[in-house]
Amino acid sequence: MLGAFVNTVTVSNIETVVGAASSDTVTLATQFTGGTLDLGAGSDKLTLGLFDNTVTVAGIETVIGVGSADVVTLAAATTGVILDLGGGIDQLTFAAAGATVTVANIETVTGSAVADLVTLNAQSTGSTYDLADGNDRLILGAFTNTVTVTNVETVTGGISGDTVTFGAAFTGGTVDLGAGSDSLSFDATGATVTLANVETVTGLAGDDLVTFSAAVTDLTADLGAGGDKLVLGAFVNTVTLANVETIIGGNLVDTVTLSGAFTGDTIDLGGGADKLTLGTFTNTVTVSNTETIIGGGSVDTVVLASQTTRGLIDLGAGGDKLTLGTFDNTVTVANVETITGAASSDTVSFAAQATGSTVDLGDGSDRLILGGFTNTVTVSNVETITGGLSADTVTLGGVAAGIAIDLGLGADALTLGAYDNTVTVANVETITGVGSADLVTLTSQATGSTIDLGGGTDTLTLATFINTVTVANVETLTGGASSDLVTVSAQITGAMIDLGVGSDSLTLGTFDNTLTVGNVETITGGASADLVTLSAQVQRGTFDFGAGTDSLTLGAFVNTVTVSNLESLTGGASADTVTFAGQATGATIDLSDGTDRLTLANFANTVTVSNVETLTGGAVSDTVTLGGAGAGGFLDLGAGNDTLTLNAAGSTVTAANAETITGGTGDDAVTVSAASGGMNIDLGTGTDQLTLTSGITATVAGAETITGSSGIDLIVISGSTAATVSLGAGNDRVVSGLGVDTLTGGAGADQFVFTAIGQSATGSADTITDFVPGSDTLVFDNSLLTGTFSYEGSATLTATGHSQASFDDASHTLSVDTDGDGTADMEIKLTGKTAADLSLSNFSWS
């Protein structure tokens, strides 16, 4: 026992040393094993000898070891004790309740049951600190320390690089390793810790909860297995993480790089313009409040759990998938192969080429904007699609109900899904439908576009521009207010095409087409049979139907149309004006009601016409057949050797320049207004009338009534029909037929010609109602003349051996004996005439 003085002693082989109230300095000269040293009050110092010492101390402010393995136990609560145990594998244990110590060169420190404060004033390499119960604190010195820590609630580092390992579960502690490149490793049982100034964090198999209370500028954390969570502070943080299942950011800018695969993990980087970079692994991550997400080279699956309003997501290589949250999102993406939206309105912009991407933005009013690349995407549930500057290929994977698509510049292609779609389209060069009813409206000019809407009852509406488009499988096509040029590349069956205002053109494909057309100025058919019905007025139409047996039906309007290569034409209820620009061969034309007009081209035309009020032929030979009973029509067949065949039911027509007119079994009333040469007219059976309005040369058969013109008419009556002929003014010539004819020459010097006995045989006499001796002449063919001819007046005929004639005043009958046998071979009744009225000069033989 030392006295109450300032003592300095060296002791040996003493098991217990007790000091007093002053400062004692004790040096152990021999090994101390199991002894107790209590130097009492004062500022005491103990120096251990160079032995493996085991000592329990109390009331000592400084303990110095030398070079061996010392085991020191603090027997009482201490404050301000300094322990430096020097070399060797040293141990320090706090036996009493609580210690505040500064230590150096101690490899193992064991704390007490209450709060301990341990400060290192020398480098610690491989030391272990277990401060037991209580709210303990470990302060590392400004050295490069390597320590294992257990049951320490607060660890504070220095200005150098510290390496700290938790030796057991860490619950609720705080670690601030200060300056330097510091490293912290967790025990396999997990840790709940608040960190600052730690550059590397490593976890094991336990569940770790790491919260950063200071800015992180270069953190690398791998929390290993378990359900781990990392919370960043409200600072500008930069971290590299692996094996963290939940990452929470602060209110400022966080930059997070994932260095390991993430599977089912959750990341919420809070406020600020945050950035997340995924590793080159197959990642599955749920992300919130992250403005920039960068993927690696593998397959990334990213789910956004919060609204993004200015996000950029580039998932790099691999078949990546992005799922948006149920918010109004605005995001820019790149290298994402699958994008799925939710129930709100999303705006997605592609910042890189999309190749084979699938985009389904779910409910809401969504918008997709493609970048200026050659993009290929499949899109569903997007209300607005905007393309870029290059060629975009867009396929709709779901039903389109009122969406707007503008693919911008480039040779773009749009494929609709197999649904009943309604879309508004601009700047798309190719549109393809599948099998349902599509309603497509173009809002921009179509130049060289190709549109095939596939099966179903489809509708296409063009915009008010000068459009050039090739279409197929469109059942209803509506043009705009400008000129549209439409080519149909597939068969049309029952389609309706109305190209609206403008000078429009429609070209049909080489198929058997059936369609209804309105407001198309030019129609060009193919090589097969086209059946076209006009649903609107045509005022200046030009239609060329090409090869095939084609049919055109006009609408009930006042139409003006030029046609070619048309086999059947049907008019409407109003006045139609039809001009054939090409040869008509076997064409059937029925212009129906209205005052209609048909003009044939300068070809050898063959047509059957009905209900045409005015027909004009060309300069070549026309063959015209009336397919219906004509009533008041005018037909001028022009130059050429033309033929007109009347309808069998009877016709009333005015004809000009028809070289041959043939009637049927009905009653015909034919007026010939002009002729370019000799005519052949056979009006067939029925009660027929022929009226001439200008000088005509014609052979006529089957006409019961013939009325001449004021000009010179040269008529040859053919056949046995009993004709009533009135030739009017002019020096006319009529050759009697084989029937019992009634002939009226009218004014002028007329010739009544007989070329055969049967033309006015005995018992079948013709009647000349107005024979004027001195001006009119009875002309007989020389083939009937025997010898000479004499007129015998009222004398009875006798056998003279030469031709002779006599007149019976009672019956006003001229008897002609052509062979001179004294018997009349012919009889001609001359109304109102007597034998004295006639003379030899009234007869002519030629």
Predicted segments, located by residue:
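Acidic glycine/aspartate-rich repeat arrays in secreted/surface proteins
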Residues: 660, 705, 721, 733, ...
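Hydrophobic "rung" positions of tandem beta-strand repeat architectures
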Residues: 9, 17, 26-28, 37, ...
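Extracellular repeat turn/loop positions enriched in glycine and acidic/polar residues, especially those
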Residues: 3, 20-22, 29-31, 40, ...
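Feature detects tandemly repeated or modular, low-complexity segments in exposed regions of proteins
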Residues: 5-13, 31, 51-55, 78, ...
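A short, compositionally biased
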Residues: 59, 87-89, 103-105, 133, ...
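Short, basic/low-complexity N-terminal boundary segments at the transition from targeting/disordered tails
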Residues: 43, 138, 181-184, 411, ...
